[in-house]
Swiss-Prot record:
The gene is ileS. Its cofactor is Zn(2+). It catalyses: tRNA(Ile) + L-isoleucine + ATP = L-isoleucyl-tRNA(Ile) + AMP + diphosphate. The keyword Metal-binding applies. This is Isoleucine--tRNA ligase.
Length: 1036
């Protein structure tokens, strides 16, 4: 494709964008459906602090397709755009730009100053977002956007929280939760699950000395930094443990029996002392590894506890427990009254209690801790292990699990409601419902919603010194309690508000909400529910449709479900499409640093937004699978789908204008069989599109487009070309024009939701004066059942299967399509052969064969050979396969032909018989000299390849036509221009030209031919003969 084509595509789409904008087409689509049933849609809010990428364009395209379709199908579809404004993504950008990276830097800078800086950059890339949203062809309402930082939105978030609190679903507690030391705040479980990486971590086995010199307990860990906080060890009471003596050191060790070979692979290296049960170890005491918390022994620390979660598949069967840094450790120690110590600050550094490592980052301390243990003879093994480890989804730093005081939503209390809500949601793809999302719901944990951050919606809890709480659910309530006018709900506006009530002073707790709480509340907060637009909000709840990426099964889809199930015992949405991840072509994550992908703007400038949309929609990424993005794939869509469609339109326009066809004058037209076929194919496609869209299956909706465009351009138009060229105003020509007009108009509406630019271009070139102004203002077409003719479609499918089979034979045996052959034999069932007998001439034309013979038996020129399909039959018959092979080799042709018809046969192996079907047999053919054969699913084709002199001469004539018409196109001649030819060629080519002069002149609009004896003009190879032409346009 040349640069001119690329420029014209981009320019044409820009022109259509201008048309939509100038004529306010999007608003007219809304006005057009005012009063119709509402199709409600929630748009997952992006952050405008980063530029949009292919993932955003993909999700935006999916949303746009569904909303456009719903609008054309008779629904009012409001499409408000929303912005996620709060949280770490914004804070992190400000911290970096202002250099506020040290602990306490934000407080010194001032929370008010910091939050106002956050407010300033929230819409840093809003213009770029609007550009890309528009350029991809997506329609959204930017004039009515909602923002999570707006006062109205934040007030509704408070209402949601207060409602949860009133239902007893909010509590304060200390739990071990995922913690980002880079951010200094806890994260939710679903945030922790979003960014796992394969990493190499330390792997150490530590020697814990039992009291009174009774040997050592061996415990394995990948987090040596937690060993300074060890408070207990745990064993499984039902497992068997062993005591052995290491011959080299003389030390006695206790570990799980099943793990013994892992750590002592050499049986000669130790002396067996005996077995003991886990239960017998419970309650025993051991010496602390480090001196920092020895005083906790009096409070119950440094004991062996029972724990039934221990497995021996890895480790030693004995688990080291640091209750501040492991959820299972925390609960086990809590149950047995073991004290908790947490000598790690919010930046992940040791506090003063660990005097030897104070101020050191915990992950950096791993080596020093292992070194110290080794020096003190407390280290049994040191190595590394590769495993999956969670990283902060925003800062890409390693997470830890840390006991913190936090506020929680009691998700586990409403788990049954969430599972019930999920049952009524239609998921695409369907496996996510009970798979990734359903399993996540089943394992749902209480949600830590408080964050030690600044730029977010403050948690509306005021607490008195004696612990009494006031939970505020509205601005009016806060104003009434505080006596102050509230103009903003961010921290720096309300942190200093003190409420005095009943002789007590209440101050707000110093936390903001997890920003996922904001987005989970958007169905209500976007409309300031319940303070405004309550009826509208309730009427549109649950949403008819949402769509986002696979990661949102543990993000937005989840938080929406938590809040909707808890507050309303309903799902938040009825239908959801989940897309996969777009990777770079090399399979890696797209990276600006690595420059491993082309920019979206470059792709749309080069190939157009429609090509990008269709490439994405027709890929596995809309089925929640990963896609390796390829610009060649986008280019292929343009070349193989969109340009042929444009060419079909250009063909119609050219000849309709040439002959003055008026689509309104189509009464009493008798359609040809090929007309009825393409219309039947069109309305069958329409039915499939409607069915697929009802199931939100965009891949299934789009996939048939490609085949239909092939049917239209490479079969219907090509086969009907002469009908359009008919100089007389015949009924057949009018039928062809009428059919092609109907197909193009209806198809432009079918594809409008998916590829909105080319559909608009088609429609604008076809629409009449009284038709709607835009294709997107049209109703989506309905199926016309009487035009669907399944038998005719099946018949045409058979014809095309035979033609494809014949062409594959020609290609395989290097027989040019333009070289005529004398005979082709088509073998199939009697019923099908009889149905196809009337179209022999059509097949002959397509295959360039003079005589087409339909047979129910393989002709004498071919012998059918069969042998076992070793892959499938080997599983069925095992070692009897050689016997079957011999039996098949001896079968007569009559039996083989019977098998070819029935698809089954019975083979006798002595007294036993075995039934075989088509999948058990491999078929091939041995052809007589001059013949070649091949089969498809339904037919066998046998080509007679023998060339006679007349066939050779006709082949030369056809090559001449092809080359002359190529020169016409290259010379930019109009389709109706007449030409004169000067020809230099050898005698055989001159003879072929003379013999087929009428055919050649008619096909090329040639009025005169003169043979010259010198080379002139462009030179061509015509079946091995050097020929040159000069073409000149002739005035009529």
């Amino acid at each position: 494709m040349d640069n001119e084509d690329k420029i014209s595509i981009s320019a044409k789409e820009e022109k259509i964008l201008s048309f939509w904008k100038e004529q306010d087409i999007f608003q007219k689509t809304l006005d057009n459906r005012e009063g119709c049933p509402t199709f409600s849609f929630y748009d997952g809010p992006p952050f405008a602090t980063g530029l949009p990428h292919y993932g955003h364009l993909l999700a935006g395209t999916i949303k746009d397709v569904v909303c456009r379709y719903a609008s054309m199908d008779g629904h009012y579809v409001p499409r408000r755009f929303g912005w996620d404004c709060h949280g770490v993504p914004v804070e992190y950008e400000v911290e970096k730009s202002l250099g506020l990276t040290e602990p306490g830097a934000i407080e010194r800078f001032g929370v008010a100053n910091f939050n106002e800086e956050c407010r300033k950059i929230v819409f840093r890339y809003a213009d770029e977002w609007k550009y890309f949203v528009d350029r991809i062809g997506r329609w959204v309402d930017f004039s009515a956007t909602w923002r999570t930082m707006d006062l109205s939105f934040m007030e509704s978030v408070w209402w949601v929280f207060r409602s949860l609190y009133d239902q007893g679903l909010v509590y304060e507690g200390t739990k071990v939760v995922p913690f980002s030391t880079k951010l200094g705040t806890p994260l939710s479980n679903f945030e922790a699950g979003q960014n796992y990486k394969e990493v190499d971590d330390p792997s150490v086995v530590v020697k814990f000395a039992l009291q009174d010199n009774q040997g050592f307990l061996l415990a394995w860990t990948t987090t040596p930094w937690t060993l300074v906080s060890n408070m207990a060890l745990a064993v499984h009471p039902e497992l068997t443990y062993v005591r052995i003596k290491d011959k080299e050191s003389g030390d006695e060790y206790i570990l799980g029996q099943e793990s013994l070979p892992r750590w002592f692979p050499d049986r000669e290296s130790y002396e067996w002392i005996g077995q003991l049960s886990g239960k017998s170890l419970v309650g025993q005491s051991y010496e602390p590894l480090f001196p920092y918390f020895q005083d906790k022994k009096e409070l119950g620390a440094f004991r062996i506890l029972p724990a039934d979660f221990i497995e021996e598949s890895e480790g030693t069967g004995i688990v080291h427990m640091a209750p501040a840094f492991g959820e299972a450790d925390f609960f086990a120690c809590q149950e047995h009254n073991v004290p908790l110590v947490c000598p790690v600050d919010n930046q992940g550094c040791y506090t003063a209690e660990v005097k030897d490592f104070v101020g050191e980052y915990i992950k950096s301390a791993d080596k020093g801790i292992a070194r110290r243990l080794k020096n003190e003879n407390k280290l049994f093994y040191q190595g590394t292990v590769r495993h999956r480890y969670p990283f902060c989804w925003r800062t890409d730093s390693p997470l830890i699990y840390k006991a913190v005081n936090s506020w929680f939503v009691a998700v586990e209390k409403v788990k049954s409601k969430m599972l019930k809500a999920n049952e009524s949601i239609h998921w695409t793809p369907g496996h996510i419902k009970q798979g990734r999302f359903g399993k996540w719901l089943e394992g749902a944990r209480d949600w830590a919603i408080s964050r030690n951050r600044y730029w977010g919606t403050p948690i509306p809890i005021w607490r008195s010194d004696d612990g009494e709480l006031l939970v505020i659910g509205s601005i009016q309530e806060l104003e009434a309690l505080s006596g102050q006018k509230i103009v903003d709900l961010h921290r720096h506006f309300i942190d200093e508000i003190e409420i005095n009530q009943n002789g007590k002073s209440f101050r707000r707790i110093p936390y903001v909400f997890d920003c996922w709480f904001d987005s989970g509340a958007m169905p209500y907060a976007q409309n300031h529910y319940p303070f405004e637009r309550a009826e509208e909000t309730e009427a549109c709840f649950p949403a008819d449709f949402i769509a986002e990426g696979l990661d949102q099964t543990r993000g937005w889809f989840y938080t929406l479900t938590v809040i909707a199930a808890a507050l309303f015992d309903q799902p938040a949405f009825k239908n959801v499409i989940v897309n996969g991840i777009i990777l770079a072509e090399d399979g890696n994550k797209m990276s600006k640093r690595l420059n491993n992908y082309p920019s979206p703007k470059m792709i749309m400038d080069a190939y157009g937004a429609d090509a990008l949309r269709l490439y994405l929609l027709n890929s596995v990424v809309v089925k929640a699978e990963d896609l390796r993005f390829s610009d060649k794939g986008v280019e292929s869509v343009l070349k193989q789908v969109l340009l042929p469609l444009s060419n079909a339109l250009a063909f119609y326009k050219t000849y309709a204008e040439l002959y003055g066809f008026d689509p309104k004058e189509t009464d009493n037209i008798e359609l040809a069989e090929i007309d009825r076929w393409i219309l039947s194919s069109l309305y069958s496609l329409l039915g499939k599109t409607r069915e697929s869209m009802s199931q939100y299956d965009l891949h299934a909706a789009v996939n048939p487009f490609v085949d239909f465009i092939e049917d239209l351009t490479n079969w219907y138009i090509r086969r009907s070309r002469r009908r359009f060229w008919d100089a007389e105003d015949s009924a057949d020509r009018r039928a062809a024009f009428s059919t092609l007009y109907e197909v193009l108009v209806v198809f432009s509406k079918v594809i409008a939701p998916f590829i909105p630019f080319i559909s608009e271009d088609m429609y604008q070139q076809l629409r009449g004066e009284t038709d709607p102004e835009s294709v997107h203002l049209c109703d989506f077409p309905h199926v016309v059942l009487e035009k669907i003719l399944p038998n005719l479609e099946r018949k045409m499918q058979d014809i095309r299967e035979i033609v494809a089979l014949g062409h594959s034979l020609r290609k395989e045996h290097k027989l040019k399509v333009r070289q005529p052959l004398q005979n082709v034999y088509i073998v199939g069932s009697q019923e099908r052969m009889e149905a196809l007998a009337q179209v022999g001439s059509l097949i002959g034309e397509e295959l360039n064969v003079k005589d087409v013979h339909f047979c129910s038996e393989t002709p004498e020129y071919v012998t059918t050979l069969i042998k076992p399909n070793f892959r499938t039959l080997g599983k069925k018959v095992g070692n009897r396969l050689p016997e079957i092979q011999r039996a098949l080799a001896g079968l007569p042709q009559e039996q083989i032909q019977a098998f070819m018809h029935k698809g089954q046969m019975v083979v006798s192996l002595g007294e036993e018989t075995i039934s075989l079907d088509k999948e058990d047999i491999t078929v091939s053919w041995a052809s007589a000299e001059g013949f070649v054969a091949r089969s498809s699913a339904s037919f066998v084709a046998v080509l007679d390849c023998q060339l006679t002199e007349p066939l050779i001469m006709e082949g030369i004539a056809r090559e001449l036509v092809n080359k002359i018409n190529t020169m016409r196109r290259n010379g930019k001649l109009h389709v109706s221009d007449r030409i004169a030819i000067r020809l230099h060629a050898p005698v055989i080519v001159q003879e072929a030209f003379a013999l087929h002069k009428e055919y050649i002149c008619e096909e090329t609009l040639t009025t005169s031919v003169s043979v010259i004896d010198y080379k002139e003009g462009e030179e061509w190879d015509i079946n091995g003969h050097a020929v040159s032409f000069v073409l000149e346009r002739v005035e009529r």
